[in-house]
Regions:
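Core dinuclear metal-dependent hydrolase active-site scaffold
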Residues: 1-64, 130-181, 250-256
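Residue-level signal for inorganic ion chemistry
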Residues: 5, 111, 223
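Residues in the short beta-alpha loop(s) of Rossmann-like NAD(P)-binding domains
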Residues: 11, 105-107, 228-231
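Active-site metal-binding motif and surrounding structural segment of the metallo-beta-lactamase
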Residues: 46-103, 189-191
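Active-site flanking residues adjacent to catalytic metal/cofactor-binding acidic residues
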Residues: 51, 75, 173, 194, ...
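Short internal beta-strands
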Residues: 99-106, 224-226
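Binuclear metal-ion centers of metallo-dependent hydrolases, dominated by the metallo-beta-lactamase
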Residues: 179-256
Length: 256
């Protein structure tokens, strides 16, 4: 059974365009420059694994006609990865089953403290989520729809985020540097989906030149850029990057 990976959003924390309508260097005539905040969907049969609940989650799910969510993985606690969490209520209304969410202890604690009603319930609001601390290796789903994962601890500025490896694909949406251990975990990839914020250096994200250096070390067959700021026009970036590296876009699908 094939696995389908959908990039629901590939924009940086303010999206493209920003809320004030500013596109930066991105051509507004190119639909691939319209970027919602980072989120990913992995589909195998009826098993839908969502990575992160961006503030744009509702529109992302509607645009991609997503009718069910089986599990949710979180990369880290920042608002551009978590603040769409309330939209998960729709899937409890349909199934009447709590949704299992997974991440490291820091992220789970943040979600529980800030969205307590989703875990404990409130008047007229039943609890919809069940918290789980992530393991290094784990599987989600059943029988031929099961997906095997490996979680990787990745430096993201002052904190550590999680990257996920599955079916020789790695998803690392937020990253400032890669350790020797990370390099071993990311060996022999078919596809690397990687943070590439802008051309200038940033303390908590990789820039374009840093991504090129990393790709030359890891040597994945294909690299897709995500978490892109308004500096990075799709066509310009596509022409500038080597042939094995391309910018992602909202709605992009990868088949594995």
């Amino acid at each position: 059974m094939k696995t389908i990976i959908t990039i629901l959003g590939c924009g940086s924390s303010m999206g493209v365009p920003r809320a004030d309508g500013f596109w930066g260097k991105c051509d507004p005539k190119n639909k691939k420059n319209y970027r919602t905040r980072c989120s990913l969907l992995i589909t195998k049969g009826n098993n839908n694994v969502l990575i992160d609940t961006s503030p744009d989650l509702r529109l992302q799910l509607l645009s991609n006609k997503v009718k069910n969510i089986s599990y949710v993985l979180y990369t880290h606690k920042h608002g551009d990865q978590t603040h769409g969490i309330n939209d998960l209520r729709a899937f409890y209304i349909n199934s009447k089953k709590k949704l299992n969410i997974f991440s490291n202890k820091e992220t789970i604690n943040y979600l529980y403290q800030n969205f307590t009603y989703l875990f404990k319930g409130a008047p007229d609001y039943p609890p919809i989520l069940k918290k789980n601390i992530i393991k290094k290796k784990f599987s989600l789903g059943f029988q031929n729809e099961k997906i095997n994962f490996k979680s990787i601890k990745i430096k993201h500025g002052k904190i550590f985020a999680l990257g996920y490896v599955f079916k020789n694909i790695a998803y690392i949406s937020d990253c400032s540097s890669v350790s020797e251990k990370n390099i071993k975990d990311l060996a022999n990839l078919n596809t690397l989906i990687i943070d590439c914020l802008r051309f200038k250096v940033h303390y908590s994200h990789l820039n374009f030149d840093e991504v090129i250096k990393l790709v030359n070390i890891l040597k994945p067959k294909k690299t897709i850029l995500t978490n892109m700021h308004i500096d990075l026009d799709y066509e310009y970036l596509k022409k500038k990057a080597p042939k094995n590296i391309c910018p992602g876009y909202d709605g992009m699908k990868i088949y594995a």
